[in-house]
Amino acid sequence: MDRVWADWYEPVPSPPFSPVDPPGPRPTTPVPGSSPPSPASTPTPPKRGRYVVEHPEYGPPPDPEEVRVHGARGPGAFCAAPWRPDTRRLGADVNRLFRGIAVSAADVTGDTRALRRALFDFYAMGYTRQRPSAPCWQALLQLSPEQSAPLRSALRELNERDVYDPRVLSPPVIEGPLFGEECDVDEDDAGSDTTVASEFSFRGSVCEDDGEDEDEEEDGEEEDEDEEGEEEEDEEEEEGDEDGETDVYEEDDEAEDEEDEEDGDDFDGASVGDDDVFEPPEDGSDGEGSGSDDGGDGEDEDEDEDEDEDEDDGEDEEDEEGEDGGEDGEDGEEDEDEDGEGEEGGKDAARRGTRAPTRPAAAP
C-alpha cells in the first residue's frame, strides 16, 4: 500500500505495518533459487497535496466540466490556472474599480478606502500563512460552490507547485486616467470626510488644474446670463405694452373730464390757465355756472365780450337815431349791463367763497 502524503502543514500518520511482514530485519539465509534480498527502500513522496482528497482550503478536486463552464463566463470566471504574478493587470483592475466608485458612489473616499483595505488584508493573510477554508473563500467572494470551481482548481494548482523564490516587484505602468487619485481634504466636526465624487477628475488627477473644464463652466454661465437678459427684456416689453394701454385709457378719461368741465357739469375748483378761452353757450345765456375754474378771469373776459357787443349795438343805433340819442342810449345800456354783471359776479363769488373781481372803469 502506498504511503499517503499531505501538505507540509497537514501531517498524515503512516499506515500500520502489515501483519504478514512483521517488523525487524529479514532473515539473511538465502532461499535456494531466489535472488539475494535487497534492502528496504522508502517510497519517494509525491508532490504536496496531490493525494489529499478533502483539502481544508480548496476542498475536493473540482469537476473539470464545472471548471470549464464557470471559468468561461459568470462570476467565477476571474482566475485560471496556472497563476502568474502580473502587476500591470492588477493595477488596471484596481483602477477600474476606482472608476466605478468615482462615478457612482455616494461616499467616494470611504469606498476607495475599503477597497484598499481589502487588497491589503488578502496580502497580509497570505504573507502570514493564514489560509481561508473553501467555505471562507466562498463567503468572502460571495460565490456559490459551483461558481467557486475555477477558484478551487487554481488554488489546488498553486499548492502542487514547488516552493517559489521570493522577489520584490517593480511598480507597474498603468494607463491613465487614474481614478483613484484624490486630494486630501479636511474633516468636518463630526469626523466624516467631505470628499465627494466631483473631486475626481475623469481626465486625470483632481490636483491638477484643467483649463477646459473652467472654459466650459464660463461659457455655461455666459449663456445663462444671456437667457436671463432676454427674459428681462421680454418682461419689460410686456409691461410697456400694458402701460401704453393704461395711458390710452387715462388720456380718454382726461379728455372726457375736460369736456365735462367745459360744459359746466363737473366743477372741481381746479385752476384754469390764462390760455383757456370761454365759449358762451348757444342759447344766449350769460354763461353763469360755467366750467371755468377761476371765476375772476373768466368773468373779466365775459364782460369784455359783452362790452364789445354793446359797443357794436351802440354804433348801429348811432347810425339810425343820431349821435345824441345813440350816445345816451349807449351809456344807459352800459350802466345797466355793468350793474347786472356786478350782481351776477357777486353771486358767483359768494357761491364759490371768493371775492368778486373788481371791474376796471369803462372807457367814455
From Swiss-Prot:
Residues 355-364 have a biased composition (Low complexity). Residues 12-46 have a biased composition (Pro residues). Residues 1-73, 173-364 are annotated as: Disordered. The keyword Cytoplasm does not apply. Residues 181-191, 207-286, 294-343 have a biased composition (Acidic residues). GO terms for biological process: regulation of gene expression. Keywords: Early protein. Belongs to the herpesviridae ICP22 family. This is Transcriptional regulator ICP22 homolog. The gene is RSP40.
